[in-house]
A protein has these predicted regions:
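A short, flexible low-complexity segment enriched in Lys/Arg and Gly/Pro that occurs
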Residues: 1-2, 135
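Short helix-capping/hinge motifs at transmembrane helix termini and TM-loop junctions
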Residues: 44, 109-111, 140, 175-178
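Short, surface-exposed linear patches
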Residues: 39-41, 104, 114-115, 128, ...
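Substrate-agnostic recognition of the 12-TM MFS/MFS-like secondary transporter fold
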Residues: 15-30, 63-80, 87-96, 117-177
Protein backbone atom coordinates (compact mmCIF):
# COMPACT_ATOMS: atom_id res chain seq x y z
CA UNK A 1 0.00 0.00 0.00
CA UNK A 2 1.42 3.34 -1.04
CA UNK A 3 0.84 6.22 1.38
CA UNK A 4 0.22 9.58 -0.27
CA UNK A 5 0.71 12.99 1.29
CA UNK A 6 -0.13 16.51 0.28
CA UNK A 7 3.22 18.14 -0.42
CA UNK A 8 4.31 21.03 1.81
CA UNK A 9 1.56 20.30 4.36
CA UNK A 10 2.70 21.96 7.61
CA UNK A 11 1.38 19.17 9.84
CA UNK A 12 3.10 16.44 7.81
CA UNK A 13 6.38 18.35 7.71
CA UNK A 14 6.26 18.95 11.46
CA UNK A 15 5.60 15.23 12.02
CA UNK A 16 8.54 14.37 9.78
CA UNK A 17 10.77 16.78 11.70
CA UNK A 18 9.61 15.35 15.04
CA UNK A 19 10.85 11.95 13.91
CA UNK A 20 14.28 13.58 13.63
CA UNK A 21 13.76 15.05 17.12
CA UNK A 22 13.36 11.53 18.46
CA UNK A 23 15.93 9.61 16.43
CA UNK A 24 18.78 12.09 16.76
CA UNK A 25 18.69 11.48 20.49
CA UNK A 26 19.84 7.94 19.79
CA UNK A 27 22.93 9.03 17.90
CA UNK A 28 24.01 11.52 20.57
CA UNK A 29 23.02 9.73 23.77
CA UNK A 30 23.34 6.04 22.92
CA UNK A 31 25.99 5.95 20.20
CA UNK A 32 28.23 8.80 21.31
CA UNK A 33 27.96 10.23 24.80
CA UNK A 34 26.44 7.90 27.38
CA UNK A 35 26.35 4.24 26.35
CA UNK A 36 29.99 3.79 25.25
CA UNK A 37 31.21 5.11 28.60
CA UNK A 38 28.65 3.01 30.46
CA UNK A 39 29.63 -0.10 28.47
CA UNK A 40 33.30 0.29 29.33
CA UNK A 41 32.51 0.94 33.00
CA UNK A 42 30.39 -2.19 33.56
CA UNK A 43 32.42 -4.71 31.55
CA UNK A 44 35.73 -6.32 32.39
CA UNK A 45 38.78 -4.72 30.82
CA UNK A 46 39.23 -7.94 28.82
CA UNK A 47 36.34 -9.85 27.27
CA UNK A 48 36.70 -13.50 26.24
CA UNK A 49 35.14 -14.21 22.83
CA UNK A 50 35.55 -17.72 21.44
CA UNK A 51 39.26 -18.49 21.68
CA UNK A 52 40.25 -14.85 21.88
CA UNK A 53 40.60 -12.27 24.61
CA UNK A 54 40.09 -8.68 23.55
CA UNK A 55 39.94 -5.32 25.30
CA UNK A 56 36.39 -4.21 26.07
CA UNK A 57 36.87 -1.16 23.85
CA UNK A 58 37.79 -3.41 20.91
CA UNK A 59 34.78 -5.61 21.62
CA UNK A 60 32.55 -2.53 21.60
CA UNK A 61 34.04 -1.42 18.27
CA UNK A 62 33.55 -4.93 16.89
CA UNK A 63 29.83 -5.01 17.74
CA UNK A 64 29.34 -1.62 16.10
CA UNK A 65 31.14 -2.84 12.99
CA UNK A 66 29.14 -6.06 12.89
CA UNK A 67 25.87 -4.12 13.11
CA UNK A 68 26.87 -1.92 10.20
CA UNK A 69 27.93 -4.91 8.10
CA UNK A 70 24.35 -6.18 8.45
CA UNK A 71 23.07 -2.73 7.47
CA UNK A 72 25.40 -2.49 4.46
CA UNK A 73 24.34 -5.91 3.19
CA UNK A 74 20.63 -5.75 3.97
CA UNK A 75 19.54 -2.19 3.30
CA UNK A 76 20.14 -2.02 -0.44
CA UNK A 77 17.92 -5.06 -0.81
CA UNK A 78 15.25 -3.84 1.61
CA UNK A 79 15.13 -0.33 0.18
CA UNK A 80 14.67 -1.81 -3.30
CA UNK A 81 11.82 -3.97 -2.00
CA UNK A 82 10.28 -0.94 -0.28
CA UNK A 83 10.49 1.17 -3.44
CA UNK A 84 9.12 -1.57 -5.67
CA UNK A 85 6.32 -2.72 -3.35
CA UNK A 86 5.39 0.64 -1.83
CA UNK A 87 6.15 -0.61 1.69
CA UNK A 88 8.33 2.32 2.69
CA UNK A 89 6.15 3.15 5.72
CA UNK A 90 6.10 -0.50 6.78
CA UNK A 91 9.91 -0.63 6.88
CA UNK A 92 10.13 2.75 8.60
CA UNK A 93 7.82 1.49 11.34
CA UNK A 94 9.51 -1.91 11.55
CA UNK A 95 13.01 -0.55 12.03
CA UNK A 96 11.84 2.19 14.38
CA UNK A 97 10.15 -0.44 16.57
CA UNK A 98 13.21 -2.71 16.44
CA UNK A 99 15.46 0.18 17.45
CA UNK A 100 13.11 1.33 20.20
CA UNK A 101 12.68 -2.12 21.73
CA UNK A 102 16.42 -2.72 21.53
CA UNK A 103 17.07 0.55 23.39
CA UNK A 104 14.58 -0.50 26.06
CA UNK A 105 16.36 -3.86 26.40
CA UNK A 106 19.64 -2.06 27.10
CA UNK A 107 18.17 -0.98 30.45
CA UNK A 108 18.73 -4.57 31.63
CA UNK A 109 22.44 -4.56 30.76
CA UNK A 110 24.13 -4.21 34.15
CA UNK A 111 27.40 -6.17 34.15
CA UNK A 112 29.29 -9.05 32.57
CA UNK A 113 26.43 -11.43 33.45
CA UNK A 114 24.17 -9.48 31.10
CA UNK A 115 26.80 -8.68 28.46
CA UNK A 116 24.73 -10.54 25.87
CA UNK A 117 21.82 -8.14 26.50
CA UNK A 118 24.09 -5.14 26.01
CA UNK A 119 25.64 -6.66 22.90
CA UNK A 120 22.43 -7.76 21.19
CA UNK A 121 20.53 -4.66 22.34
CA UNK A 122 23.16 -2.26 21.07
CA UNK A 123 23.56 -4.09 17.76
CA UNK A 124 19.80 -4.20 17.13
CA UNK A 125 19.43 -0.57 18.22
CA UNK A 126 22.15 0.45 15.76
CA UNK A 127 20.57 -1.57 12.97
CA UNK A 128 17.10 -0.22 13.76
CA UNK A 129 18.28 3.38 13.99
CA UNK A 130 20.35 3.36 10.82
CA UNK A 131 17.79 1.42 8.81
CA UNK A 132 14.91 3.64 9.88
CA UNK A 133 16.86 6.68 8.67
CA UNK A 134 17.03 5.30 5.14
CA UNK A 135 13.24 5.08 4.96
CA UNK A 136 12.74 8.35 6.87
CA UNK A 137 14.98 10.23 4.44
CA UNK A 138 13.15 8.70 1.49
CA UNK A 139 10.03 10.60 2.54
CA UNK A 140 11.52 14.06 1.91
CA UNK A 141 10.57 14.11 -1.80
CA UNK A 142 7.17 12.66 -0.90
CA UNK A 143 6.23 15.37 1.62
CA UNK A 144 7.88 18.45 0.11
CA UNK A 145 8.28 20.03 -3.29
CA UNK A 146 11.82 20.36 -4.61
CA UNK A 147 11.99 24.07 -3.78
CA UNK A 148 11.23 23.22 -0.11
CA UNK A 149 13.72 20.34 0.31
CA UNK A 150 16.39 22.50 1.96
CA UNK A 151 14.02 24.24 4.35
CA UNK A 152 12.24 21.01 5.30
CA UNK A 153 15.48 19.10 5.76
CA UNK A 154 16.98 21.93 7.83
CA UNK A 155 13.90 21.94 10.04
CA UNK A 156 14.30 18.22 10.72
CA UNK A 157 18.01 18.71 11.37
CA UNK A 158 17.30 21.56 13.82
CA UNK A 159 14.61 19.58 15.64
CA UNK A 160 17.05 16.70 15.90
CA UNK A 161 19.74 18.83 17.49
CA UNK A 162 17.33 20.38 19.97
CA UNK A 163 15.78 17.04 20.93
CA UNK A 164 19.09 15.27 21.37
CA UNK A 165 20.65 18.04 23.46
CA UNK A 166 17.59 18.17 25.73
CA UNK A 167 17.76 14.40 26.29
CA UNK A 168 21.50 14.52 26.88
CA UNK A 169 21.06 17.24 29.52
CA UNK A 170 18.31 15.22 31.23
CA UNK A 171 20.47 12.09 31.16
CA UNK A 172 23.50 13.89 32.57
CA UNK A 173 21.33 15.37 35.31
CA UNK A 174 19.97 11.91 36.22
CA UNK A 175 23.47 10.39 36.18
CA UNK A 176 24.82 13.20 38.35
CA UNK A 177 22.04 12.65 40.92
CA UNK A 178 22.97 8.97 41.34
Amino acid sequence: MQTTFVKNDAKVIKSWAMFDWANSSYSLVISSAIFPTYFLSVTNATIHVGNTDMPNSSYFSFIISLAYVFVAIGLPILSGIADYSGKRLYFLRLFTIIGSLACISMYFFRDMNTLWIGTVGFMLASIGFTSSLVFYNSYLPVIATEDKYDKTSARGFAYGYVGSVILLIVNLFVIEKK
